[in-house]
Amino acid sequence: MAFTAAEKSVIVQEFQRAPGDTGSPEVQVALLTNRINYLTPHFVKHKKDFHSRRGLLRLVNQRRKLLDYLKNTDNERYRTLIERLGLRK
């Protein structure tokens, strides 16, 4: 796995909306972003690893869908999350 349970719990605590919240879009997007950032350097070294690239694209698409959902339901939370994660320029 990309990161340990301790690292995962730190991310959850940072982005949770209420104590024990692990399912909110903010937490899910933050965890996916962490996994994406962990996997991305692998593809600089291994340009032809298409099998793993497919998994990375799956994660990116899942994050995009969650961000689209958040943008459509609560635009202010979306903008705050984008700013905190540094996803858009």
Swiss-Prot record:
CDD domains: Ribosomal_S15p_S13e. One of its GO terms (biological process) is translation. InterPro entries: Ribosomal_uS15 (IPR000589), Ribosomal_uS15_bac-type (IPR005290), uS15_NS1_RNA-bd_sf (IPR009068). It comes from the Bacteria. Transmembrane segments: none annotated. GO terms for cellular component: cytosolic small ribosomal subunit. Keywords: Ribonucleoprotein, Ribosomal protein, RNA-binding, rRNA-binding. GO terms for molecular function: rRNA binding; structural constituent of ribosome. Pfam families: Ribosomal_S15. SMART domains: Ribosomal_S15 (SM01387). One of the primary rRNA binding proteins, it binds directly to 16S rRNA where it helps nucleate assembly of the platform of the 30S subunit by binding and bridging several RNA helices of the 16S rRNA. Forms an intersubunit bridge (bridge B4) with the 23S rRNA of the 50S subunit in the ribosome. Part of the 30S ribosomal subunit. Forms a bridge to the 50S subunit in the 70S ribosome, contacting the 23S rRNA. PANTHER family: RIBOSOMAL PROTEIN S15, BACTERIAL AND ORGANELLAR (PTHR23321), SMALL RIBOSOMAL SUBUNIT PROTEIN US15M (PTHR23321:SF26). Belongs to the universal ribosomal protein uS15 family. This is Small ribosomal subunit protein uS15.
